[in-house]
């Protein structure tokens, strides 16, 4: 489902710096090997806010999401393993993302079309954001991710600052709830299987 991708892991159109000159933390920068190292590993989808009412309504269906990024610096791809809880059910998905280093974007093909999102690295190394449709005022949106399911007020500070810059009220923010996660048992099963495969090889 394309919308699931949009809401949890990278999508929509590129961010245009010229249209947001006052939003310092929304200015895209090239993706380097250091950037890829920084986003390697396990991440949790924390919250998002969209001006598009349809998207805002859909994110409310997402109870919890976590995923793993495994970048390939040579091929400029990222292997994604995603665990998402919707309607008290765990949905597991794997795919490859493409990295556009100079543009600071990551993309994925959905329904034969390539969708993009800008990866925005924050001051706090344990968080990052994705910017959605910032060149389309009616559909502006942001999502924030962290290396733990719970975040501090300070960690969400840059996310809130960016929302203010885009004139998206905090009341539009939809948060996930880790207590509703149903995927942790499946993740543990996958980890056990991987360790067994490594032991046999």
From Swiss-Prot:
InterPro entries according to UniProt: A1A_glycop (IPR001500), Calycin (IPR012674), Lipocln_cytosolic_FA-bd_dom (IPR000566)
Tissue occurrence: Expressed by the liver and secreted in plasma.
Signal sequence coordinates: 1-18
Known outcome of mutating residue 174 to M: In allele ORM1*F2
Residues that bear Pyrrolidone carboxylic acid: 19
Chief place where the protein resides: secreted
Keywords of the record: Acute phase, Disulfide bond, Glycoprotein, Pyrrolidone carboxylic acid, Secreted, Signal, Transport
Factors inducing expression: Synthesis is controlled by glucocorticoids, interleukin-1 and interleukin-6, It increases 5- to 50-fold upon inflammation.
Effect noted on mutating residue 38 to Q: In allele ORM1*S
Glycan attachment sites: 33, 56, 72, 93, 103
A GO cellular component entry from the record: extracellular space
Disulfide bonds: 23-165, 90-183
Classification via CDD domains: lipocalin_AGP-like (cd19451)
Pfam families linked: Lipocalin
Localization of this protein: Secreted
Domain comment, as recorded: Contains a beta-barrel that binds various ligands in its interior.
Family to which the UniProt record says this protein belongs: Belongs to the calycin superfamily. Lipocalin family.
Protein name: Alpha-1-acid glycoprotein 1
Gene name for this UniProt entry: ORM1
């Amino acid at each position: 489902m394309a919308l699931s991708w949009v809401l949890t892991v990278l999508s929509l159109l590129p961010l245009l710096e010229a249209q947001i000159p006052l939003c310092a933390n929304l200015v895209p920068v090239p993706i380097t090997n250091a950037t890829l190292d920084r986003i390697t590993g396990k991440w949790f989808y924390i919250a998002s806010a969209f001006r598009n009412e349809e998207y805002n309504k859909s994110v409310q269906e997402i109870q919890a999401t976590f995923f793993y990024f495994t970048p390939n610096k040579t091929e400029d791809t990222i292997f994604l393993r995603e665990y998402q809880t919707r309607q008290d059910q765990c949905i597991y998905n794997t795919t490859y993302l493409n990295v556009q280093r100079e543009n600071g974007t990551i993309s994925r093909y959905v329904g034969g079309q390539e969708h993009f999102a800008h990866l925005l690295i924050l001051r706090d190394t344990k968080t990052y954001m994705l910017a959605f449709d910032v060149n389309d005022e009616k559909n502006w949106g942001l999502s924030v991710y962290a290396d733990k399911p719970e975040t501090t007020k300070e960690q969400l500070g840059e996310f809130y600052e960016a929302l203010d810059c885009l004139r998206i009220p905090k009341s539009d923010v939809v948060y996930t709830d880790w207590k509703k996660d149903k995927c942790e048992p499946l993740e543990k099963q996958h980890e056990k299987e991987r360790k067994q495969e490594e032991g046999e090889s």
